[in-house]
């Protein structure tokens, strides 16, 4: 985790396909919101997916994708330039347009406007692959789950949500997903601040991470409030002038 405490907090969650990243993010958000409510503070949280930063496929590639013959897990399929630019703009407090990715048609479908937030959580298999992105993250998490469980979860999800045939899912997993995980995803575990074993089954780790993030958020807010109080006091004394203020 970064030593410098400042908002927004940008949390990255990486790990293999269907290892429980989304479930873990949802639990972290739930815990953060619950803790914030108890302390009487409001916390704005944005949840993003690396899917939004897939590059646009050609017509031929979309056909291959529908047949389970396209490798989505290779780094070349991610627009890391756009991802790094978007995250930097969010850190700078700017409103951004996030592409909307349709998992069924393997295509982009417009954008969604995202306002500035105090906590930004983004998840994706190759999230820790690009150095520029890693440098922007306040906290980097890597979720581990055994290969058999990940394949079982992937089968259930892709059959239920994307209407994919089981044999197509298994073929794509064997030919592309598993080899790409070993070559590109697993090695990025070394960049993680925290490794979460057993995936979404690890409630203890999720709760501890949420508590740590909540405490970090509290310290930032308190520090910011104290700085503002000092600044206001100096302004009253006439020994401090806020940036860009005009002389009276």
From Swiss-Prot:
The keyword Transferase applies. ATP binds at residues 15-23, 201. It comes from Caenorhabditis elegans. It comes from the Eukaryota. This is Probable uridine-cytidine kinase. GO terms for cellular component: cytoplasm. It catalyses: uridine + ATP = UMP + ADP + H(+); cytidine + ATP = CMP + ADP + H(+). PANTHER family: URIDINE KINASE.
């Amino acid at each position: 985790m970064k030593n410098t405490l400042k908002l927004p907090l940008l949390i990255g969650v990486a790990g293999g396909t269907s290892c429980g990243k989304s479930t873990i993010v949802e639990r972290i958000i739930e815990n953060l919101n619950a803790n914030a409510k108890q302390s009487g503070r409001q916390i704005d949280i944005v949840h993003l997916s690396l899917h939004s930063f897939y590059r646009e496929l050609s017509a031929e590639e979309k056909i291959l994708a529908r047949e389970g013959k396209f490798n989505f897990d290779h780094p070349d399929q991610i627009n890391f330039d756009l991802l790094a630019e978007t995250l930097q703009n969010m850190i700078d407090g700017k409103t951004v347009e996030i592409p909307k990715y349709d998992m069924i048609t393997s295509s982009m479908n417009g954008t969604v406007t995202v306002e500035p937030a105090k906590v930004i959580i983004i998840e994706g298999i190759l999230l820790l692959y690009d150095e520029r992105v890693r440098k922007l993250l306040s906290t980097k998490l890597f979720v581990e789950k055994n290969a058999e469980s990940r394949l079982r979860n992937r089968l259930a999800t892709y059959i239920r949500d994307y209407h994919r045939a089981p044999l197509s899912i298994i073929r794509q997993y064997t030919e592309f997903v598993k080899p790409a995980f070993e070559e590109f995803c697993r090695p990025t575990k070394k960049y993680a601040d925290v490794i979460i074993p057993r995936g979404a089954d690890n409630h203890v780790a999720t709760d501890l991470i949420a508590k740590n993030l909540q405490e970090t958020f509290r310290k930032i807010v308190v520090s910011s409030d104290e700085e503002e109080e000092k600044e206001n006091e100096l302004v009253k004394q006439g020994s401090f002038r806020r940036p860009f203020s005009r002389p009276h």
